[in-house]
Each structure stands twice: as C-alpha cells, then as structure tokens.
C-alpha cells in the first residue's frame, strides 16, 4: 500500500470532522513544529545580495520619480506622482521592516544600518518601532498584551470620548493614525516610540531607541532645512503628500491583516492564548499588482508565525504549510490589478468591530450601533 502524502493526511483525517462547522477558536490539531517541518529548508535562507537588490531597485525608483516630478512641476502630474511615490515609500518601509525582523540578512550590523537608512528616510524611528513590532508578533491575538490595532475592552471603550471613537472608526481618520501611534501608542496604552524610558522598552533597549530617535531627528531637521531652501509647498508636493499616502497604505494593510475577514475571528486572553493560536487569527490578503511592489507583505500568516523567513520565500512557505493549516488558513480573495474589494472589507470592519467583552478568555468583536449618533454634551 502506498503511503499517504502529508496533504492527504491532514485534509482527510485532521479536518474531516470540521468540514461543515469550523470553529476558528478551537485549539488546532497541529503544533508549530509541524508547520515548520513542512517548509522547505531553502525558504529559511537569507540572501543579503538579493535583499540589497530590492533596496537598490526601490531607491532608484523613488529617486527617478522625484527627478521627474521636479522636472515636470505640473499639478496635472502631481496626483499621480503622490499615489506612486507614496506606494514606493510603503515598499521602502517593508524592506526596513524586514531588517527589523532579521529576515533581511544574518548580519545584525547590516540589518540595523540598512533599516536605519530606510526607516529614517520616511520618518520612522527604526529601533523604537522594531521593538514594539516585535512585541506585536510575540503577543499577536492577545487582547491584553498585543501592541497594534488591539481591540478595546468594553469598559475602556465606554470610557474613551466621542472624538477618540470618531478618529478610531470613521474613515479616513484611521488611515492617518500611524504618526500619532508613534507618538502616543493606542487608546489604553501609554508611552512613545521616541522616548527611551517609555513603557515599550526594557532598560537594555534604551540606547537603541536613543540612536533611532537621533536619526529621526536628523531627517526631520533635513526636511525643515529643505523647506526653507525650496519652500514648504514644494516640499509638500515632493515629500509631504507621498508621506501621507505611505501612512494610509501602512494603516490600511496592517489593519486588514488582523481585521475585516468575512467571519469574525477570535481574540484571546489568559490560558486560552498561545503563540500558535494567536498567529492563526491573522489574515492573508491579495493586493493585486501591488503584491510584488510591496514585497509580498500580504502573505501574513506564515510571516507572523515565522518572521525570520525572507519575504521572497513567503509564498512558497505558505504553499507548503497550507496542507497542515487546513481550515485555519483562510485563502485570500483574488484581487484584480487594484484591490478595491479590500476597501469594502475595511469599511465593514470599521462599522462592526468596535470592542470586545471585558471577561472571557476567547472573545470576538462586538458592535456599538449608536457609535456616531451624537457627541456627548461635555465634549
């Protein structure tokens, strides 16, 4: 009798009983090691030259766009420039994000140097964000300890003011949240990505935060100097507007990787949470023609479970892992060239996903039907 392939084993046995009614909050019938073992060994290999080639490609593209915009200096061209350049700023961010994870190369020095250059150029404090993002990965799906786009417990939700809810749930304001998050974090959390004494950081991490804050300050000072040299309007056209598009991309993508799926997904507390169960609540997305431009950031599930895998191996790693993941992997909707369908997912989530219960170790988003009816009189 021939042996069954791994996909047959998992598809026919492990998930047969869940074929008609699948509970995404149920403990998975596999371990993290089982997923790791089916991912080809070469997917874990980091090629610094290949990683640097993406940096060179993106930087050349950004510089070329700046040159074209300055040469044409046309209001007819600027909206197109802003859209494309803001998209490229986001691509630059993703490469710096890979440096922070250590998936860029095996050299910590190379990762940190490249990461600082890329992130400082788009006003991101490299180490400050790297450390908080590491916290996010280590606590994904945990209501109490996750770091970004965390659901508010009902008591906190009822406590925050109307203006906070308006900015948090009323499009387009959530798509402009990132700079404020860097400064003040999310509702219910304190600290800053620029302050080495923030609650975000351990004492041994303070020197790294200082370095990144200094690099950010140098870039901010350079931008101010360029404003005096070339005018604030010119700098807004060349840098400011693309920066806003980049921020919108970042908030759009990071939100949809943890929200907006067609069926509500669980969040955890206490003993019900585990690294594996939290990671399985993340969602892959198809961004159409932007998949390659954004370095396959949409392959998010495997990235969250194994952030050390380089982005150029994530598609292959995901394909290899899917037979093990079974229904715990949610196949993303196929996109046309432009992922317009994701705007619908975002809008639906903003209207429905407002808070979670204060109690219970497995919770789901609940809806406040009166969220925008009227502002309180004391506001």
Swiss-Prot record:
It is found in: Endoplasmic reticulum membrane. InterPro entries: FA_desaturase_dom, FAS_N, Fatty_acid_desaturase. A motif (Histidine box-3) lies at residues 300-304. A motif (Histidine box-1) lies at residues 97-101. The chain crosses the membrane at residues 52-72, 213-233, 236-256. Pfam families: DUF3474, FA_desaturase. GO terms for biological process: unsaturated fatty acid biosynthetic process. Its EC number is 1.14.19.-. A motif (Histidine box-2) lies at residues 133-137. It is an enzyme of class 1 (oxidoreductase). The keyword ATP-binding does not apply. One of its GO terms (molecular function) is omega-3 fatty acid desaturase activity. It is a multi-pass membrane protein. Its main location: endoplasmic reticulum. Keywords: Endoplasmic reticulum, Fatty acid biosynthesis, Fatty acid metabolism, Lipid biosynthesis, Lipid metabolism, Membrane, Oxidoreductase, Transmembrane, Transmembrane helix. One of its GO terms (cellular component) is endoplasmic reticulum membrane. Pathway: Lipid metabolism; polyunsaturated fatty acid biosynthesis. Belongs to the fatty acid desaturase type 1 family. The histidine box domains may contain the active site and/or be involved in metal ion binding. ER (microsomal) omega-3 fatty acid desaturase introduces the third double bond in the biosynthesis of 18:3 fatty acids, important constituents of plant membranes. It is thought to use cytochrome b5 as an electron donor and to act on fatty acids esterified to phosphatidylcholine and, possibly, other phospholipids. This is Omega-3 fatty acid desaturase, endoplasmic reticulum.
